Amino acid sequence: MILLHVRKEGENMKKIILASGSPRRKELLELAGVPFEIVVSEVEETIGAYSSPSDIVMSLALQKASAVAENNSDHIVLGADTIVTYESRILGKPSNEAEAKEMLQLLSGKTHEVYTGVAIIAKDKTVTFYERTEVTFWELTEEEIDAYIASKEPLDKAGSYGIQGKGSIFVQHIQGDYYSVVGLPISRLVRELKQFNIDVTHA
């Protein structure tokens, strides 16, 4: 069993709060043995004039975490955001099936990038970081795309696919962190949490 270690003696154990309702991020934290609670951020995400996808995901992750941290200042709050990009075009969650089909046709046979940004907020410290992963799709037939859209899986996913689900059959090659594409670069996160005197790597 993996336990939470807080190294400052005499300090009350701080809760880790995930500022996201994503079932995939929840599953990854559970997989790593990170104890946490969920408080879904209700913040309206706004994308300003940022210079890069990495800036966008880190800013959105920080917006989510900050909104929850306002009422949980004694604890550690995690926020995360994921976007898919292809040739400088940002592919978020599709608004409908037609948009999902357009995105999948665009990604067919091509290499795109997935950025996930993470923000960790505590009373005396804030850390933000991101991971970039390249994903290459096989050439997709219209029948494959239509069948996938009919499953409804792509409708709540950035880029209109879930690499951990049925969308996995579209992936020819991946370079980078698979878990970041799922929604949370869990290995990097565990290491960054050590800056907050939290270590989940010891049994």
Curated annotation (Swiss-Prot):
Q: Where is this site: Important for substrate specificity?
A: 24, 82, 164
Task: Tell me which family the UniProt entry assigns to this protein.
Answer: Belongs to the Maf family. YhdE subfamily.
Q: Which GO terms describe its biological process?
A: nucleotide metabolic process
This one is known as dTTP/UTP pyrophosphatase
Q: What does this protein do?
A: Nucleoside triphosphate pyrophosphatase that hydrolyzes dTTP and UTP. May have a dual role in cell division arrest and in preventing the incorporation of modified nucleotides into cellular nucleic acids.
CC terms in the record's Gene Ontology section = cytoplasm
What cofactors are annotated for this protein? a divalent metal cation
Q: Keywords, A to Z?
A: Cytoplasm, Hydrolase, Nucleotide metabolism
- What compartments host this protein? Cytoplasm
Question: Which EC main class describes this enzyme?
Answer: hydrolase
